[in-house]
Structure formats: structure tokens, C-alpha cells
């Protein structure tokens, strides 16, 4: 889970879970929906070469990501937001953000996978060594044993 620790600061995630209580799963669902929309808007703005249209979805994703401890995702969104603002002021399009947008999409997907794993017990991987308990009496029901 080294990678998970690098993508999500679980202390912030758990703090948010504790603060929101029973509403946590619903709010996490909003994060997923808003995040998907923000990533799609950022990609559309890149295709349209519209620097101004990058700012709000990047800003939104930055703030929501930090709320759940997804700092690497927030950092990429912040870079996109800051560079887009600069480019709006300069009257140019930030082509240099293409790798950041690709990274943003990948990080968002990885973050959502980790959040799902942390909140849905069915998605948790089984412990190594098989399933169930080891039976102590293995001769039960066998002839001659």
C-alpha cells in the first residue's frame, strides 16, 4: 500500500470521515461526481484551447481533493489552475499543461479506486493464505483416522 500512502493522506481522509459521520459516503459520492465532471471540463477546455475554462474546474477539484486527503491530485489541479490563470492574463493557451492533464486524469482514477477500496468492504482484497479458518481436526469423517 506504499502507493496508496503516496496518493492519499489517510489521516485527512479519516478526519473527514469522522467529521461527516453518516453523511460521509454521500459526500464522497459527490466528490466522485464533481471530480468526473471537473476532469471532463478540463479535458474539453484543453481540446478547445480555452485557458479560462480550465480555471474553475481545476479550482473545484483542488479544494475537494484536499478535503479528502488527496494532496497529489490537489497539487496537479492547483498547477493547472495557476498556470491557466497566468495564461488568461497573458492572452495565451497553456499547451505545456497537456502532461499535467493526463496525470490529473490518472491520479483521479487511482484516488477513486483507493477511496472505493477504503469504503466498500466487498472491494477489499482477501488476506494472503486463502479464505476461512484453518480446521484443526482434518481427520473428521475419514475412515481409519
Task: List where the protein language model places each region.
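Amphipathic, coiled-coil-like alpha-helical segments
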Residues: 1-7, 24-32, 38, 64-79, ...
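Extended low-complexity intrinsically disordered regions
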Residues: 1-19
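Solenoid-repeat scaffolds in large eukaryotic assemblies
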Residues: 53-54, 73
Amino acid at each position: 500500500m506504499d502507493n496508496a500512502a503516496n496518493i492519499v493522506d489517510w489521516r485527512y481522509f479519516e478526519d473527514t470521515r469522522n467529521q461527516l459521520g453518516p453523511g460521509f459516503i454521500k459526500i464522497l459520492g459527490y466528490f466522485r461526481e464533481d471530480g468526473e465532471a471537473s476532469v471532463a471540463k478540463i479535458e474539453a477546455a484543453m481540446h478547445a484551447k480555452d485557458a479560462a475554462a480550465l480555471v474553475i474546474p481545476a479550482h473545484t477539484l483542488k479544494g475537494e481533493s484536499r478535503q479528502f486527503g488527496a494532496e497529489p491530485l490537489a497539487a496537479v489541479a492547483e498547477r493547472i489552475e495557476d498556470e491557466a490563470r497566468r495564461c488568461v492574463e497573458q492572452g495565451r493557451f497553456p499547451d505545456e499543461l497537456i502532461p499535467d492533464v493526463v496525470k490529473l486524469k490518472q491520479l483521479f482514477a487511482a484516488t477513486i479506486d483507493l477511496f472505493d477500496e477504503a469504503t466498500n468492504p466487498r472491494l477489499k482484497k482477501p488476506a494472503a493464505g486463502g479464505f476461512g479458518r484453518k480446521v484443526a481436526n482434518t481427520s473428521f469423517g475419514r475412515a481409519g483416522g
